[in-house]
Structure formats: structure tokens, C-alpha cells
């Protein structure tokens, strides 16, 4: 599944310059911490339909110094490209599987990794994949193999 997704994403040349600029400006947080914030926001957002700004405000107390700009930009980008990202995931599921069968943490991790690989030209795909696996090991039970 990973090879198929990688091949599909390699064929697409899309650059989200605004998110890339914010990513470069993130000096206070390690990239993995920024991704973890983005994951936590995505996971939290999966439980309600409130606007993204409210999700960020509601969760900003969890993070020392608030939510970083990179996490906000990535989650906003994922929200904008939600249908396209979910189509990519769904197209690689086994027969009979739907997105609703995937746990919320695993789905948030997959969305984050696919967004980075498809829309951010300054993040190597190998880094996105590795970070996704690390998040899955930390936040899922026996589902890290799925990611």
C-alpha cells in the first residue's frame, strides 16, 4: 500500500507555498513536535463539527506557548483538501473496508502524512512516512502496522 501511495504522490507536483514558508519559520519547535500538535488537532477535530478556529482555541492550552503556526497551517490545509486526501486513502483500502472502519488516530495520522507528502515540497516523503509510523506507535494500539 505504501509503495502505491508513494508512486501516486510522486506523480503530483503541488506546492502549498504559504504552508512551506510557515514550516521554515518554525524555529521554536522541532518538526516532530509540530507534527504531533497537528495530529492532536486533527484527532480532536474528528469528534466535532465546530470550525477549525474553535478547535484550535479549545486545544491551545494543551501546548506550551499555544498551537504552533505550522500545525495550524497543516490542519487548515488538510481541512481544505479533506475529500481529496480521503479519496487517496480509500483507494488503497482492502476490499470491504471503508474510512469509517479506520480508527480516528490512524486516520488522523494518514491524513497528516498524505498532506505533507502531496502538498509540502520541503518535507521528504521518507520523513513523512517515518513520522507517521512514530505517531502510530505512540498513539495507536497494534494499529501502527496499519499505517
Residue ranges and their predicted role:
Residues 1-146:
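N-terminal interaction/assembly modules
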Amino acid at each position: 500500500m505504501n509503495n502505491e501511495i508513494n508512486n501516486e504522490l510522486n506523480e503530483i507536483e503541488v506546492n502549498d507555498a504559504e504552508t512551506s514558508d510557515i514550516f521554515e519559520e518554525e524555529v521554536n519547535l522541532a518538526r516532530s513536535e509540530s507534527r504531533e500538535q497537528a495530529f492532536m488537532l486533527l484527532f480532536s477535530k474528528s469528534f466535532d463539527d465546530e470550525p477549525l478556529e474553535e478547535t484550535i482555541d479549545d486545544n491551545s492550552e494543551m501546548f506550551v506557548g499555544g498551537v504552533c503556526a505550522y500545525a495550524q497551517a497543516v490542519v487548515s490545509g488538510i481541512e481544505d483538501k479533506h475529500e481529496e486526501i480521503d479519496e487517496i486513502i480509500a483507494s488503497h483500502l482492502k476490499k470491504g473496508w471503508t474510512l469509517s472502519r479506520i480508527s480516528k488516530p490512524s486516520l488522523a495520522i494518514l491524513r497528516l502524512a498524505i498532506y505533507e507528502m502531496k502538498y509540502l515540497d520541503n518535507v521528504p516523503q521518507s520523513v513523512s512516512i517515518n513520522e507517521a509510523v512514530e505517531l502510530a506507535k505512540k498513539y495507536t494500539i497494534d494499529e501502527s502496522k496499519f499505517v
